[in-house]
Amino acid sequence: MANVVVVGAQWGDEGKGKIVDWLSEQADIVVRFQGGHNAGHTLVINGETYKLALLPSGVLRPSKLAVIGNGVVFDPQAFLDEVKKLQAQGVAISPENLRVAENVTLILPLHRELDAQRETAAKAGAIGTTQRGIGPAYEDKVGRRAIRLMDLADLAALPPKIDRLLAHHNALRRGLGLPEIDGAAILNELAALAPQLLPYAETVWRLLDIKRREGKRILFEGAQGALLDVDHGTYPYVTSSNTVAAQAATGTGMGPSSVGYVLGICKAYTTRVGAGPFPTELKNEIGEEIGRRGKEFGVNTGRKRRCGWFDAVLVRQTVRTCGIHGLALTKLDILDGFETIEVCVGYRLDGKEIDHLPAGEGAQARVEPIYETIEGWKEPTANARSWADLPAQAIKYVRRIEELVGCPVALLSTSPEREDTILVQNPFEA
């Protein structure tokens, strides 16, 4: 299989950035296909820490082409700020090695403001968004009133499009008690951004098709996790895009047959940010300890992540909904030293045992985890780079996860460092 799709197999924050960076050494092109700058990830390379949000991890690899696909919602200012920050760290970024789909939807300041107003007004019922305008931008895309990158190339044709956008947003703003927005202000802002953004614009579906036919290896980089998918996740506590592997085709303009191996990323435990059901959440000292060891705070927002035991039911479900061929298991080292480790192997709902997470919000909140206790290990797994470096009990834990989710572990990560990775099966050669 020449192409590889990387998706999160939990609620995001699984360590996709490191795995994508590790795989990108073998890829020619790295493509983002959904989400926006709400999904941050941290990479540590030769002791230097890089924090990415919107840009594909491939930008950190010299000679690789990084691409932002049409399935992404694109904040122009966030993009320019991130490029500038990475350039200050010595990363070479230019239109030569970074391309952006011309039909990508733009996130504007009005989207961010609306996002924040809604979350504030919802109070206890808030979803827990990053308030970066992701959802409102996707709403405008589906509502056929979005401004897209290609629109900046024809400023004379922009006013009617802005008027259509504001007919919707100013009505909302009146209802929220906010002042209306003048279309001229948006036009002036976009006109100022156009010369900075348009050099990156590309007909991405055509570019990728040409590269695929040339035999280039393409790595599709997903954001968030499959359990945040707007259709298959814990709705309504989800993101506003499809995060499952099938979106790699839709979000880039490539056909489904162009997507090869699907690699699912999951932690050796479970975390979640924001509100929503979490069957294995540990609201005790063990959960706090996992959070401290794993440094479980959001890269972009700094929000504390909720922590719990590994949920094999959920990962097995995402293996199916994403068509995952192999898993990359991360942060195994965080579990070093625990006397025993619990793994969720099933649920109990209203007195009955079930083997999947139900779709209903109420039912999701009522499920109770059924645990299997596994013996822990005392020896460290941190920085291990081969199976021989791992304690026998840690290997047993990995093997048990494989059995429970019905999917082999292809990669094992034992620290944030790029080289601390154990390869079992190379996704590009599977």
Swiss-Prot record:
Its cofactor is Mg(2+). IMP binds at residues 13-16, 38-41, 130, 144, 224, 239, 303. InterPro entries: Adenylosuccin_syn_GTP-bd (IPR018220), Adenylosuccin_syn_Lys_AS (IPR033128), Adenylosuccinate_synth_dom1 (IPR042109), Adenylosuccinate_synth_dom2 (IPR042110), Adenylosuccinate_synth_dom3 (IPR042111), Adenylosuccinate_synthetase (IPR001114), P-loop_NTPase (IPR027417). Substrate binds at residues 299-305. The active site is at 13 (proton acceptor), 41 (proton donor). The keyword Cytoplasm applies. Its main location: cytoplasm. HAMAP family: Adenylosucc_synth (MF_00011). Belongs to the adenylosuccinate synthetase family. This is Adenylosuccinate synthetase. It comes from Rhodopseudomonas palustris (strain BisA53).
